[in-house]
Amino acid sequence: MNRKCICDLCSCGKHHCPHLPTKIYEKTEKPCFFSEYTEKYPTYLSYVPRESFKPKLEYQKVNIPMEGLSTTKRDFGTFNIVPVKHHLPEKATPIQDEMDFLTTYNQHYNYCPANRVNPIKPRDNKHQCNDKMECVPTYKADYLPWNQQKRSSIRPPQSYRPASCRFDHRTTHQDDYPIKNPVDTVSYKPPHGPKLCNIPLESMTSYKSSYVAHPMEKRCVYEGEKYKPSEVPFDSLTTHKDSYRGLIGEPAKTWKPAPNHPGLDIPFPSNTEFREKFQPWPTPKIVPKESIAYIPPEGKMDLLTTVQADYKCPNGVPAQSCRPVIHLKKSDRFESSTTNREDFKHWANIRREPVKPNHQLKFSDEPMEYMTTNRAHYVPHAPANTKSCKPTWSGPRVNIPLEGQTTYSTSFTPKEIQRCPASYPEPPGYIFDEVDAVGHRLYRPASGATSQESNHLGFGDA
């Protein structure tokens, strides 16, 4: 027997069975697709889900095993590796010559005798006075010397007398530390030759030899206690259900207007306020003007421009620079002689002439030839008149009234709105059977005659 519940009988998506929260007393394999989300957000039959942008699995992997040879193994072969030859340094040989203790200063320094420099400042008075000046300074006139004995000097007497012989430039360090030749030491460093050992490596270690295996104890597995359901029946009563009782009220009335409006039978007026106030003006018919046929000139086209006709090549010389010559300030030589001036004489300062580029462009005396590539290869052609594919103008539009009919008004067929069978207290054509463990109110279909009569009920039946 095909039984249906309110969820299956509803055609508007607003009615469903009062589902219970849990079902622990009945074990059924039939899944229940009802949830809080499907209750609040019903599915729309007119909505089509969009296509997935996930790429399709068009590529199929070949079952042939992959070759172990790579590009590097195929293109690059093996080479015979030769051991690296290490360079052995040469033995150091001591120099037999004696070391000279001359410094860079003694080698490059040249002694120059010093001469007295003549005074640079001229004398104030050219005529010298030979008379002696007789005057006493203020210090000598005011301060007279005391008659005291001169104190003896505390400075020790100078007992050092420099030797008359020549200084031999020997130091204490040179006397105490003589020069020693380098000693050849024997190197105990092993040579860098490769050591190739053919003896295989022993895998036996001290850990393997001294390890003693002990038997493992069996692990104790704890079994979990089996679930025992409570004998007290579940009343499914919550604080919310206990405090707030639902009252049976009248069904909500729909505010949707009736589809058959009385004003839809009147034809739509095509005349508007704009058409009544602004009438079309009588415009005269436009006569198209005949185009004048193009007549090409008989002579050839003169390609000579105004610049080519009037320009003449001037055979002139480029202009010279008007920049004044910079005069160097020359002064008299300084009348003095120093060691630096005697060693470093003045250089002959000669003025360098400016570097002028050579004129590479040479203007010819012959007149300019105005023959170009366009003139040499240009062939005049007659212009081709293209045919216009633009449709002809049919004149001003005639005032034709607008048709009030549309495609929707001609092809629309009104249909009868049927009431949802789940909105009745008892669905017509079905008899209540039972309520299952989940909370679905199951109905079985009645006889065929009763179901046919109930299907023809209109929208106004209550």
From Swiss-Prot:
One GO MF term attached to the UniProt entry: microtubule binding
Compartmental location: Cytoplasm, Cytoskeleton, Microtubule organizing center, Centrosome, Centriole; Cytoplasm, Cytoskeleton, Cilium basal body; Cytoplasm, Cytoskeleton, Cilium axoneme; Cytoplasm, Cytoskeleton, Microtubule organizing center, Centrosome
Protein known as: Stabilizer of axonemal microtubules 1
UniProt cross-references to Pfam families, sorted A to Z: SAXO1-2
UniProt family annotation: Belongs to the FAM154 family.
GO CC term (a single one): centrosome
Organism per entry: Rattus norvegicus
GO biological process assignments: cell projection organization; cellular response to cold; cold acclimation; positive regulation of cilium assembly; protein stabilization
